[in-house]
């Protein structure tokens, strides 16, 4: 019997008197086929260390520990630590870290792996309410995570993996795809969780690029320009730019010069621009003094 089998999950929760906290976005997966599929998608083997976020009672952790060299699982809810010690007692390659992943010193933590030189993959069922902050925190860290295979709200997965000229495409798509490739691997129905969430989930596979997708002069400015271009999705790029930078004649002149330099029409909408287009735009606006 697996931890994820419904009868086992229920027995574990009952034995420990565990109640779910909405503030932690807790939904436990009870489908072993999906858990195996996650491990297969992540291509976990003995030559890989894994960081897991939000292990819950250890359903996914069990599958990871059977395949990986070592698993480091970050759990913010201290009520789950003794439960994990119980459910994962047969594994000597699992470290449970009772800490918020956003506050963890990951550079120090990964040195605690028995073999810290192995490639590191992130595999997790992320809480819906904090998916984006966790992802961006990990992506922007200086730790060379090889890839992420993470479960999240389907809508967020669609936004991250979206292409230009689609409804889902936006600044989040750009922020992630600048660093990583992103593809939805498969959909997970809401019915396989306890308690069941209100929406379906998706498994998103993200692989780190050897180099960022494009070369730009100022990354912070690039991300700022991409974000402001989607503040009002139905407005033109020109309207979003002037709303942010200002509408004085001097600013308008600089914006006109920058757009011309990047060969981008002011009447276009942000959703029509590729990441490469945003790179050219940011560099051009920087060049004209914005």
Curated annotation (Swiss-Prot):
EC number(s) from the headed UniProt entry: 2.1.1.182
PROSITE patterns (UniProt xref): RRNA_A_DIMETH (PS01131), SAM_RNA_A_N6_MT (PS51689)
Keyword Hydrolase: no
SUPFAM superfamilies (UniProt xref): S-adenosyl-L-methionine-dependent methyltransferases
Keywords of the record: Cytoplasm, Methyltransferase, RNA-binding, rRNA processing, S-adenosyl-L-methionine, Transferase
Residues annotated to bind S-adenosyl-L-methionine: 27, 29, 54, 75, 100, 125
GO cellular component, one term: cytosol
Enzyme class: transferase
Catalysis performed (reactions): adenosine(1518)/adenosine(1519) in 16S rRNA + 4 S-adenosyl-L-methionine = N(6)-dimethyladenosine(1518)/N(6)-dimethyladenosine(1519) in 16S rRNA + 4 S-adenosyl-L-homocysteine + 4 H(+)
GO MF entry, a single one: RNA binding
SMART domains found in the cross-reference section: rADc
Predominant localisation class: cytoplasm
Annotated InterPro entries: KsgA/Erm, rRNA_Ade_diMease-like_C, rRNA_Ade_Mease_Trfase_CS, rRNA_Ade_methylase_Trfase_N, rRNA_adenine_dimethylase, SAM-dependent_MTases_sf
UniProt subcellular location: Cytoplasm
One Pfam short name: RrnaAD
Family membership noted in the UniProt record: Belongs to the class I-like SAM-binding methyltransferase superfamily. rRNA adenine N(6)-methyltransferase family. RsmA subfamily.
Role description: Specifically dimethylates two adjacent adenosines (A1518 and A1519) in the loop of a conserved hairpin near the 3'-end of 16S rRNA in the 30S particle. May play a critical role in biogenesis of 30S subunits.
Family matches, as HAMAP family: 16SrRNA_methyltr_A
Protein name: Ribosomal RNA small subunit methyltransferase A
Organism: Streptococcus pyogenes serotype M5 (strain Manfredo)
């Amino acid at each position: 019997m697996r931890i994820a089998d419904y009868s086992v999950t229920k027995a574990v929760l009952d034995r420990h008197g565990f109640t779910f906290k909405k503030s932690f976005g807790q939904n436990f997966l009870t489908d072993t086929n999906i858990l195996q599929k996650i491990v297969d998608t992540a291509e976990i083997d003995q030559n890989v260390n894994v960081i897991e976020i939000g292990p819950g009672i250890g359903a996914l952790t069990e599958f990871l520990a059977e395949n990986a060299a070592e698993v480091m699982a970050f759990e913010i809810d201290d009520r789950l630590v003794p439960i994990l010690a119980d459910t994962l007692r047969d594994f000597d390659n699992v470290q449970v870290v009772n800490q918020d992943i956003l506050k963890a010193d990951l550079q120090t933590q990964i040195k605690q792996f028995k073999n810290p030189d192995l490639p590191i993959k992130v595999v997790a069922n992320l809480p819906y309410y904090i998916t984006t902050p966790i992802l961006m925190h990990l992506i922007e860290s200086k730790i060379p995570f090889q890839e992420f295979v993470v479960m999240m709200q389907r809508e967020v997965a669609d936004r991250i993996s979206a292409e230009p000229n689609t409804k889902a495409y936006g600044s989040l798509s750009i922020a992630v795809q600048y660093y990583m490739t992103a593809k939805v691997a498969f959909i997970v129905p809401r019915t396989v969780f306890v308690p069941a969430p209100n929406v379906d989930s998706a498994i998103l596979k993200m692989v780190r690029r050897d180099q960022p997708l494009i070369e730009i002069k100022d990354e912070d400015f690039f991300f700022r320009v991409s974000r402001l271009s989607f503040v009002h999705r139905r407005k033109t790029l020109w309207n979003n730019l002037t709303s942010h930078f200002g509408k004085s004649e001097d600013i308008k002149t600089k914006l006109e010069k920058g757009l011309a330099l990047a060969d981008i029409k002011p009447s276009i909408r942000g959703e029509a621009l590729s990441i490469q287009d945003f790179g050219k735009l940011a560099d051009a606006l920087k060049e004209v003094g914005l």
